[in-house]
A protein has these predicted regions:
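Residues that scaffold, gate, or flank divalent-cation-dependent active/transport sites
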Residues: 1-64, 68
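A residue-level signal for conserved active-site and pocket-lining positions in enzyme catalytic cores
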Residues: 12, 22, 65, 100-101, ...
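Flexible, glycine/proline-enriched loop segments at strand-loop-helix junctions
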Residues: 35-38, 73-78, 124-125, 140-145, ...
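Generic non-transmembrane alpha-helical segments
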Residues: 47, 51-55, 85-94, 156, ...
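Active-site-proximal beta-alpha loop/turn segments in soluble metabolic enzymes
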Residues: 67-73, 137-139, 151
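Catalytic palm subdomain of template-directed nucleic-acid polymerases
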Residues: 69-87, 161
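Long, highly charged, low-complexity intrinsically disordered interaction regions
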Residues: 79-144
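Helix-hairpin-helix
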Residues: 100, 138-161, 166-172
């Protein structure tokens, strides 16, 4: 299966596609292909997760490269700087740049993380902490990018005129 970097996403390469199905497309786009080293990935993940867990009182590991952190122990005005410093600490300690998305729900945090990763102005930390930011983020998020919305559900929603996460929030 294929796993992508940010550039691969912008080229339209599909996540999880079997390599043999997209081999010609990858070659045509001059994409570098590497085999997986799950032992190394697991070791690096443990290092990152260890550093994250030292920084916050509560953490939920979601996958090999994702975790949800509880920042409620911080004052609201301190969260952004704390997150930037944490991201720098992780990169310095592991060589791995991370993105931190902060929001009141896990789904919004994943959307915030997407913005932090894909828009340079955020410096890898995006916070959705008010209604204006929530509305803007949801309006800019395609329904197929929402956590838990798969291909079949995306098709059904689009047939109902639901194209963005914002559209979804406006339905009954």
């Amino acid at each position: 299966d294929v796993y992508r970097s940010g550039n691969d996403i912008r080229l339209g390469i599909k996540m999880g596609a079997p390599f043999f199905q997209i081999k010609n497309e990858l070659e045509a786009k001059e994409v570098a292909v590497f085999s997986s080293n799950y032992t190394l990935y697991g070791d690096m993940s443990r290092r990152v997760m260890s550093l994250l867990s030292e920084a916050v009182p509560e953490m939920q590991i979601y996958s090999i490269d994702e975790a949800f952190l509880d920042f409620s122990f911080l004052e609201k005005d301190d969260i952004h700087n704390f997150a930037i410093q944490l991201a720098k600490k992780i990169e310095k300690g592991t060589g791995i740049p991370i993105t931190i998305g902060i929001a009141p729900t896990m789904t919004l945090a994943k959307i915030a993380s997407h913005f932090g990763k894909n828009y340079n102005g955020y410096q890898h930390v995006c916070i959705i902490d008010n209604e204006e930011k929530r509305k803007k983020a949801l309006q800019l998020t395609s329904i197929d990018e929402v956590w838990g919305v798969g291909h079949r559900l995306t098709t059904k929603m689009r047939n109902l005129g639901i194209n963005t996460a914002w559209d979804f929030t406006q339905t009954n």
